[in-house]
Amino acid sequence: MELEERGLQLLDVAELEEPQRGLRVLEWLRHLRRVLPVITRAEIKENQKQLVEQLLLVMMGFPGPPARRLLAYNMAFVYSSGDTFSVYETIDRCNDVIRSKDDSPSYLPSKLAAVACLGALYQKLGRLLGSTFSDTVSNLLKVLRSAESQGRSEIMLSLERILKGLGSAAIPCHRDIYKAARSCLTDRSMSVRCSAAQCLLALQKEASFMWGSDLESLASICFKAFEGSSYEVRLAVARLLGKVLARAMQGATSPRQNARKLSLQEVLGLLSTGFLRGNSGFLRGGGDMLGGTSVTTRHVRLGATQAYIVFIRTLGGHWLARNVPVLLSHSLELISNPKAIQNPTDAACSRCCISYILRATVGELLGEKAQLEAAREICEVIRKLMKTVDAVLSDSNLETRFCTTDISASQHVLVCALQELGDLFLGLGTILAPLLKDSSAGVLDTVLSVSLHPSLSARLAAAWCLRSVIVSLPSLAAPVLDRCVERLTALKSSPEAVSGYSLTAAVLLGSIRLCPLGVPHGKGKVVMSLAKDLLCTASQNSRFSLQRTQAGWLLIASLMTLGPAVVQSQLGCLLLLWRSVFPVTPKDLDTERRRGDAFTWQVTLEGRAGALGAMRSFVSHCGELMSEEVLQRLLPPLPCAIALLTLLPSLQKLYGNSLKACSVLYRQRLYQLLVLLPPKTYEESFCAVMKELVADLTSPDYSPGGAAFLLSSVCHPDDLVLLGPSFQECDQRATEEELLLSSGIPGGSLEYDLHAIYELPSEGESVPKPLPSAFTVIQAASLLFGTLLAHMPESQRPQILQQLVESIKQTKGSRQQSVQLCAMSSLCNFLKHLASSRSNLGPEEMRKPCLSLIQAVLEGNSLWLRCAGVESVARLVQVVDDPTFTAGLIQASFDKLKTARDVVARTSHSLVLGTLHRYLGGINSSQHLASCVGVLHSLSQDTTSPEVQTWALHSLSVITDLSGPLFNVHIEATLSLLLTALITTSPSHPEVHRSLGRCLSALVTALGPELQGNGAVLSSQRTSCLLACSVMQENPDCLVQAQGISCLQQLHMYAPKHVNLSSLVPTLCVHLYSPHLPLRRAVLACLRQLAQREAAEVSEHAMTVAKEGHEDLKMEMNMRELGLEGVLLSLLDRESDQQLLRDVKETLLHMQNCTGLSRLSFWLRMLKDILSASADFAAVASVDTNQEDEGEVACSDSVLTSSKAESLGSSVTPHWKTRIFAMECVCQLITQCELDGGAHFDMAQAQEMKHKEPERDFLVLHLQDLIRMSFMAATDHSEQLRLVGLQALLLVIHRFAAVPEPEFPGHLILEQFQANVLAAVRPAFNTDTPPDVTARACEVCSAWLASGVVKELADLQRVQQLLLTSLRRVQVAKETASVYSESTTAMESLAVLKAWAEVYIAAMEKQVTQSKMAEAQNEVLLSLVQAELLTLSGLWLAALQDHALLTLPAACASQLPSQGGGFYTAETSDAARPHYLLSWAPILHASSLWLSSSGFVLPDQDEGNGHLSRPVTPTSMGQERGSQLPADSPEDLNLERFHLILGISVEFLCCPPVDAPMERITSCLRALKALLSGMWPKAHIGTDQDLAIELISVLHRLLLMRESSEVQLLVLEVGRLIVNAAQDHVRERRRSAEVDDGAEEKETLPVFGEGHDTGGLVPGHSLVVAALELCLCILIRQLPQLSPHLSGGSVVGKTEPLFSEARLLVASSLGILAELPSLCSPEGSVSVLPTLLYLVVGVLQDTTVKFPDGHLTLPVTAALQALKVIVSSPMSQVEKCRASWTRLMQSAVSTLLNSWHLERQLVPDSVSLLTALTIFLLSANPEVMSDPGLQNACVQRFQNSIDSKNPTEQLKCYRLLLSIFKHPVPEVVAPYVCSLAPRIMRHLSQAESRKPQSMEELLVLQEGVNLLKTLVSAVEEQNRPSMVCMLLHLLISFLLDENALGSAPHYSRALHDFGLHSLTSFGASYPTQFRKLMGSSPALRSRLEAALRGNQESLKPKAPSRGTMGGGHGSPSIQLKTNFL
């Protein structure tokens, strides 16, 4: 079906036939729209004639609405790009079609298409069409009179386009068009009204009379248009009226427009006439006085409200900021006008409208500074009004006092003002602090003064406003609560004061859970005491007994929101209060009933309702305290409470209506409580409660129109769309709900339920809006009915349901509908409860009453009832779970649908088919499914009834969604049906289009990933889906457009390649600023998904749209400058919908993740502009003058705000929440760069790479911006932003601290920003700063000090002084009163101690690791800490003790100190735990360092008794502070401190939480390492073997759980310290025994150590085994081939080089293994030796690899060192185990010898293996290597190396032999000398014929001579002459004569010099042999003389080079080389 898009394609329309004609035409028209803008004009002209002919054929072919729009666009584009010669013929043709007398429905589409074409032609060509427009306009206006609704709407839209195209040229027709549009503005068709409003909006741009002489009449007709209007009409007409009024006030823009300019007061007066307007018409007006304001009036009021907002938004934020007082005054005058508040319903609607006006203008258009001023203005209004009220109320003259009407008016004004003030406070957050501190404004006093207002509504509004203050500024919670308590106590005799201040206190208590810093724990006790006092004194005076009773229980109920921690201590008192408020026995209740009067019963019922409300609050908020015991103590009042429930009807009959309200409230509270309690707890009262429930449900006190409050519990959320668009989310939801619920419900309000004031509002609401008790009691009753009926005996259930059936039969009309809805709600709740508990309905007789209830509503007239009935049918089938029953119901619906012709039956039964699928998980029968789909298909094509179509399509969408693969056979037919309906259905039926959209969405889901397929069928289906989406996107209804975007989003998810982003992204950009919330939500959800995959492409397409200037792209932000990212950021300040805001943020984060690195400058600049938009630049300049470029400072106006002045509708500056998000984005960018690595954190490299590749960017180049942004955020007025700013600063310090400054070597790049950092953190240490900000600042300070950036003492001291200030606060924290919770004090104290700990750790670690150059700086840092170390150490230990106590299991709770710990109180222990969790690890490490460095030496006794050195120490654990303790010995203190540190460490390391950060684990291990480095702990753990074993076991477990190499290395270091401690202990015991027993018994000494006499090492009781397991764990993990099991049986597997971390781990493990024999007894050493030798030799075999330069790897070096330690162990010398050691070592040698023959991947290093053999030769017992076989094998290995061609190997072999030849035991050396010396001599003698060619060869010869010299000195005297002679011969052979010396190569000359030098020294040592040799060999003598002569000659010109003279010793150069490598 898809047309080729390579060029212009023509279509022969005449040849097309149905049914494919419509689709083919639509596709061709879409193809033209895409192609025409991109092809050349010449090509268009070439094909113009054919194109026009085909388009005219389409016009005459009865096109549907989508084709009509495309046809008009293409026709206009062809003429605008081609020739215009034939356009007049086309216009005439269109006019002829319009004038046609054919009025048949089939010809109507052609007429509508002609009208559309005319409009498009005139809009595109404009004045080119000359004067033809007058004929066209008159023709259209003439036809308009007789046109039907679609025609009238299309003509209005066409006239709008004509006006836009012609501009001022159409002035002659303006009046005619105006008259026609005015009449259409009140058309009965809503779509015509919308079109007329659009037409007039276009007209007003040129027709000055509209906002001049005709303004009043236009306003009047607009108000009339609002009557009976829809939501869309109200928006359109309000937009017209608001724009016209704004134009009227702004005045004429051109000289010819001479209309009078209106004043603001005149405009507001015009708008107010509509707002206050009653019903138009004489007869309808009378109803207002009798029955209240009608719905029609409310329509007008809603429209006027929207017009107010459009008017103000058109004038813009700057205008509003100047005119806030006027707007406030006018708005509040409106609400005080008697016409606006004629009755409660009217007043509620008016209040809602005024609040909406203020919120949409003051709340959205103003920046933060302007909002602060607006808040000040509102406060002034409130103050003046309260002064008036106070003055009048205090006036004793009754005639001049306020009448009731005046009080009512003032209350509504106050409610609106206070609500807006509260919303402003919530939006401003902590920024409003300066306003609240301003005494001249007196905000708090003003708001609190309203608490004494006579009206309850005003008092509630004041309370809620104060709640907003507290949520914004938590520091005021405690002070304001104190003020309320004080006023309550002082003014208990004033009913208004008791009510007002108790409400305020209750709302404050309810808001404390939103304040993370809380309030002091004692406030709960104070409030509880006050509440008890109010309840106890309530009966003293009847004048205020009701208020005191209400206030007491309200305070108790709100107290429950503080949670179990506060309530637990008051629980006993609460239970007594609850018990005392109800009679104890039924007899007491009966006695009560006989006494009292109406007022007494009113107070009693209010009190008991309050008690029940407090119980409900307790159960809701303190569930943790609901133990079985508490539940049993809570239940006794219930039977009497239920008994009183049954008495209420008789009491009401007795005392009249005065008890009605409180009895309804009592019922409501009791029902709500019973719903929360387990039904079994009141089982004996089931019947009594059920009787009352049925009575309530069958006599509801509301009109049926107000039943919407029950819909959420009855209908499925997906089905609510069938009830109308009012149930959809929209920006005007609050006001629209007031209209929706107007029939019988006066809107939700706090005065209907005082207990709602301490609850949280629903999402999207700023204030809770409980419904009146008459409605709430029905809600609670229906919920409780469902629960109780499910728990009642099955035999009683049918009777109860039958009662409902009978009750319905006994009522009629609207009353019957109310009862039916109550019954359906109850039945639905019952069925839901059964389904959730997986219970069955029960016996068959239950079905009859259920079906009776359902059948009665399924065919009723009420939409709501039908929806409820359908839902109940499905749920009934679900719980019956009987296929026969289900089939019968389905068949009954089929039959009904076949026979019934009425709309009601067809809608309800069609929906039944869908909902049955929903609750049965799809009907798994293809036959059933085919029948359902067939029926619904036919109903969906019933064009005579849009309602039937809507319901049938909705049901079809449900079936499609739930049928799974069974639906696949119906996809093609359903798609065809959808497309046909979309093409043909009129836009005037948007509900049908919405159902089509839901159906398409379900189809796309059903197709799923198959949409990616390439088959013909799938390709066709995919094309159909895309076509349907495009049609929906062009629908005028916003919900349909949103569905189209959502469907495209689904298609993109399943088949991303087939969704064209170049067309989708522009559409999304156009709708970003749509006035419709659902559309914006769909756009952002789609963008979020696109950004996850194709962020860069989306950004590019958006920028293309901005640059090309899309005609529909109208937004305040300049996308061309800011890109899509900047526009999205601006939305954060415009939007209030939480879901939409989340989508915006996620989209931005995805885009940043994708493009952040490639567009780093763009992101940083944009984020910086947001942060700069409202920053204090003076503050920035004060610390940054040297670092800020003047040009940059001058450009402080950001790109986000620079273009604001250019547009009237200017945007506000970014709010604090937006700035917080921007700062979080900065932090994420830093993290991104960190993950990317590279040059982002290296200035020199970044500058170099930037020079080479200018397009690349690096973070380090923007460091100045990062610091600046962090500073701006950290010093902002918003506390939340300060937190994020400090976090960003911390991140910058961590990432850039080590970056050097390339321009100044030896300096760091951050040094230049010291002033900025200090200025950023200093404000956080002010006394009025919240503790969380101070805690974060402490973290920054510690990181800054520890970073090493600060080097000067003065700079260090400035930062240290800040920490010192906090430390002083910590010391007196317990004695200082705080406005925050005690846990917050603990948080701040621990943060300070943690900061000091981190600085101390850094100073101590640098002392060990830094170079000498940095020692001076480090000493300064350490000295700063040392000065406070005595104080800090005591506080650190106290904090650690607290942490140890708080980590005890719950079973040990009784052992915790009753007064709490050093930094927490017992009541806030749960809240303090997280703070300890964050801080304990660094404190533990610092404490360990301090203890180990001081050697566990205590301070002097005088100091020890001081307050600071031992505030809380382990010796006082669990003791009260006041008790006097005897001084413990230093040993005891040391022991307890040691166990405190060790206990915390072991407890954590035993099983660290999965989410525990790695830093916490490493800190803990470092603490252990530091602790065990001290002498005292080392000695202690050495003596306690069980403790050492346990600690090693814990470390072993940690190794198994953590793969981090850092952790593993630390574990091994700690393990080594433990082994060393045990080693020292064993050594000390042996030394002591040696001293005690004397030398004569030395053979008995080595019995110390593990293994004793038996040699047995028991796992779990052996430190050696534990350490062995620890090391084995590491070795096997790094070298699996060590384990035969892991390596598949072979001892040696693959040998692969290890990484550096692995090498360190292996080396460290071997170091521990080598020490293990020293821990054993001789017998024990024999037990462990085989394993040790196996592991060490195995490591040697597996890691030794030959390198070209001959260097050894770390594991090899460590293995050789370990081998030496083991082989030379004293245990090998002990007689009783010497033989065993010898055998085992011989086995090891044998294994080593076999290493030469193993098959390996890498060539083994012979030198390493020879070194190992040499170690055995030199260090082991002589008998180990005395075995002839081993000797021969060893000799053979040395011979091989001597003969090696590798000089490096030869050299090292010679050196090894040198150490062997020096061995003092001749028996060891002899075999090697005999075998190897001749071979060495032969090798050296070859030098005469083959001179050395390299330094290595030269060194080999030199080393060989040294070896022979050693032999000469070691040989016996009688054999020495011959050896000397041989050596002299050899040395002389090295010499060159005088002829050869001059031309000799360098190395030959070096050998000559070496020989000559050696001869000199050696000859002097053996002169006799030398003279004898010279005398007997003239040849040698002459050679020597020639060499000497030549040498003399060479000395003359230059001094001899000493480069090789030292070669005789050889070692220095080689040693240097080895060390270097």
Swiss-Prot record:
Gene3D superfamilies referenced in this protein's UniProt entry, alphabetically: Leucine-rich Repeat Variant
Skewed-composition ranges (Polar residues): 1512-1522
Annotated region described as Disordered, given as residue ranges: 1503-1528, 1989-2012
Repeat as UniProt keyword: yes
Sorted UniProt keywords: Repeat
Family membership: Belongs to the HEATR5 family.
Descriptive protein name: HEAT repeat-containing protein 5A
Organism: Xenopus tropicalis (Western clawed frog)
